[in-house]
């Protein structure tokens, strides 16, 4: 009797492993039935050779004479996969940047926020936009703050304003540390956790299955996720004494499961930035793009009063510098 029970207990780990593997295969097969397809996004993709690889960004000319928008995406995403809903809901000129190692931007060295900030400023200079509004979502907030700090250190003022969305000026709390340390493994391509998240999202919106598959397919490799997560774990702008901000607004996502709304509010208060609340979760750009566009446009219209907003005449480009979307 004891022998039979011992054998049964010994087989439990193997049975559990087989069950997990079969579950993984079922989820993989279900997700594999959806063909990844991006939404139609206007504008052109431009690329710049750099010392660290290649910088790519999308520029969308707008009809609204207000300040252009420079959009900086968050961790594990790309310009197109985050910002396409906002682009569809604004008539402003938009520059949406793929950070190094993300989207179409290539990176042959370690990812850092300083390098990402340089990429943002390089895209602004190459695009020809004058006094744009800098918009950062999630990790894009720290990258944008780093870019603004670099400008302040140089004694320059190139932005009409700054909009922080669902982000924090510090990521050093224990909860942040644990979450960010685990994220590169939990959210890398092929991760069972990521696959189950995609399946749940697809089942909630089956008519958007192809678009959802595309958003998950364009995530960066694990190396970039790990290096970006390491930068986040070190980031704390609360003690920066050389940061000079343009007019700004901080969008608080009240139902955020990634960045505690209390940390968002504390970040804004620490930097002296007024806040606007939205009753959304972390992916607010997907959930409420029209409301977000309205907040950005109303704030930046006030900031731009009596300010010349225009686009410089671009220098002639070699053939092939602009790409189709």
Regions found by a protein language model. Give the residues of each.
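Hydrophobic alpha-helical topogenic segments used for membrane insertion/localization
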Residues: 2-26
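Conserved HGGG/HGGXW glycine-rich cap/lid loop of the alpha/beta-hydrolase fold
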Residues: 58-104
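Active-site loop/oxyanion-hole signature of alpha/beta-hydrolase fold enzymes
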Residues: 95-133
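Gly/Ala-rich beta-loop-alpha elbow adjacent to hydrolase catalytic centers
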Residues: 136, 140, 144
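Catalytic active-site module of serine/aspartate enzymes centered on a nucleophile-bearing elbow/loop
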Residues: 273-325
């Amino acid at each position: 009797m004891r022998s039979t029970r011992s054998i049964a207990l010994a087989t439990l780990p193997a049975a559990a492993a087989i069950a997990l593997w079969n579950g993984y295969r079922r989820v993989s097969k279900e997700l594999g039935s959806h063909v990844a397809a991006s939404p139609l996004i206007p504008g052109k993709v431009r690329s710049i050779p750099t010392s660290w690889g290649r910088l790519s960004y999308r520029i969308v000319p707008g009809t609204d004479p207000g300040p252009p928008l420079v959009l900086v995406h968050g961790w594990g995403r790309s310009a197109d996969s985050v910002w396409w809903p906002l682009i569809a809901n604004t008539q402003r000129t938009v520059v949406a940047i793929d950070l190094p190692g993300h989207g179409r931007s290539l990176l042959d060295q370690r990812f850092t926020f300083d390098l990402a900030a340089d990429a943002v400023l390089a895209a602004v200079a190459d695009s020809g936009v004058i006094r744009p509004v800098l918009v950062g979502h999630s990790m894009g907030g720290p990258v944008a703050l780093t870019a603004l700090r670099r400008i302040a250190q140089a004694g320059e003022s190139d932005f009409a304003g700054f909009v922080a969305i669902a982000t924090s000026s510090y990521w050093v709390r224990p909860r942040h540390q644990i979450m960010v340390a685990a994220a590169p493994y939990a959210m890398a391509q092929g991760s069972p956790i990521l696959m189950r998240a995609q399946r749940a999202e697809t089942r909630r919106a089956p008519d958007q299955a192809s678009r959802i598959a595309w958003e998950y397919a364009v995530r960066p490799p694990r190396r970039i996720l790990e290096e970006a997560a390491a930068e986040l774990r070190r980031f704390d702008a609360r003690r920066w004494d050389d940061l000079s901000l343009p007019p700004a607004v901080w969008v608080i996502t009240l139902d955020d499961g990634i960045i505690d709304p209390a940390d968002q509010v504390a970040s804004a208060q620490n930097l002296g930035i007024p806040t606007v609340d939205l009753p959304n979760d972390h992916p607010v750009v997907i959930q409420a793009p029209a409301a977000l566009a309205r907040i950005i446009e109303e704030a930046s219209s006030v900031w731009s009063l009596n300010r010349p907003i225009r686009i410089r005449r671009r220098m002639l480009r070699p053939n092939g510098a602009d790409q189709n979307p």
